[in-house]
Structures are given as structure tokens and as C-alpha cells.
């Protein structure tokens, strides 16, 4: 399963015309090697190393660095204090309110954990809350901040990638037309569609432990 946190980084690089090299990687092996841990002591991925040896972890930090390192920095990160703060607000919203919930809902569905009814119910309630907040906001505009793609949009689309693949099925999508339209607008944007690929929507999500 693709690491959803990487897509926002790759999309920001694409908009900035920055070529990123993605080396071969085996989870639990590469990130436990002495060479990797020397550069990234926490052993976490994604991890970034620049041509000058600059090393960075945490996907939001890497995405911000890549976004700030090219000609579209002001578009991606905001042209003034207010737009920058709004972009950061939405990035934080996805990180705190939606991504952990998506993990709880997806992991058992892809064989990386056991189904737990209490966790499932709580996580689904939280996802509904997050999508409802987005639905209301996106009723005022097609994108999260302004009228061009920002790092907020790229982060949001990356965060919801697994959700649309495994959880937000057709009946659920009908409840959030603004969110679906926004998601498609982001991932089908000609500048980043190569990164996100064709939208992969689940028709009926798996229920219980079936």
C-alpha cells in the first residue's frame, strides 16, 4: 500500500519542478540499518536527504521544505501572513483530526491489525466530523485557501487518499459532494495528476471483521 504521506511531498515537488530521487526501500530493513539511523536517528519514514546532505523527517516538515524551495513557494505556502496561516491551519487540521482516524479505519482492512468495534465506531464518528467540517468550508470555494492549489490542498488529498480507497464508499460520498468535487479537482489537476494517479474510489467498504 502506498505511503499516503508521501504524495503531498511529491506533488509539491512537481509544482516546483523539483526532481526527487526515490531510492529502493524495504520497511523494517532500510530504516533499521546503521547508515539510515546515522542520518535519521528516529528511524522514521518518509525521510529526506538533500544533495547538500541536509536531512529531514516528518512528512509535513519535508513537504513544507520542498514547497518553499521552488518558484511556486508563494502559491503553495501563501502570499501573506493571513493566507499562510490559513494554509497551516488546514495542514494541522488534517494531521490532528483526520489522519489518525483514517489509520484506525484502514489498518485492519489491509491486514495490518485486528478489527475492534469500539475503535471502528469512534474513528468513523471522527471521520464524519472531519468530512462535515470540510463539506461546510468547501461550500464557500472550490479550494481550501484561495483559487490555486496550495500545500493545504495537497496535504488534504494525500490524507484522504486511503480514506477514498477503503472507507468513503458510494453512499458516504453522496453525503459530501463538496469534498468529493474538491478532492477530484486536486488529484486531477494536470500539474499533479501524474503523482496521484487515477482516483481509486471504493464502492462498498468492508464492514466488521468480514
Curated annotation (Swiss-Prot):
Stretches assigned to the GST C-terminal domain = 80-206
Q: Which CDD domains match?
A: GST_C_EF1Bgamma_like (cd03181), GST_N_EF1Bgamma (cd03044)
Q: Which UniProt keywords apply?
A: Transferase
GO cellular-component terms in the record?
cytoplasm; nucleus
GST N-terminal domain: from which residue to which, for each copy? 1-74
One GO BP annotation is: translational elongation
Induction description: Expressed under high amounts of nitrogen via regulation by GLN1. Moreover, components of the fungal-specific velvet complex VEL1, VEL2 and LAE1 act also as positive regulators of expression. Finally, expression is induced under acidic conditions in a PACC-independent manner.
Q: Which domain of life is it from?
A: Eukaryota
State the deletion phenotype. Does not alter fusarin C production.
One annotated GO molecular function is: transferase activity
Q: What class of enzyme is it?
A: transferase
Which family does this protein fall into?
A: Belongs to the GST superfamily.
**Biological role:** Glutathione S-transferase-like protein; part of the gene cluster that mediates the biosynthesis of the mycotoxin fusarin C. Within the cluster, FUS1, FUS2, FUS8 and FUS9 are sufficient for fusarin production. The other FUS cluster members are not essential for fusarin C biosynthesis.
Please state what the protein is called.
Answer: Glutathione S-transferase-like protein FUS3
| Organism this protein belongs to | Gibberella fujikuroi (strain CBS 195.34 / IMI 58289 / NRRL A-6831) (Bakanae and foot rot disease fungus)
Q: Which gene encodes it?
A: FUS3
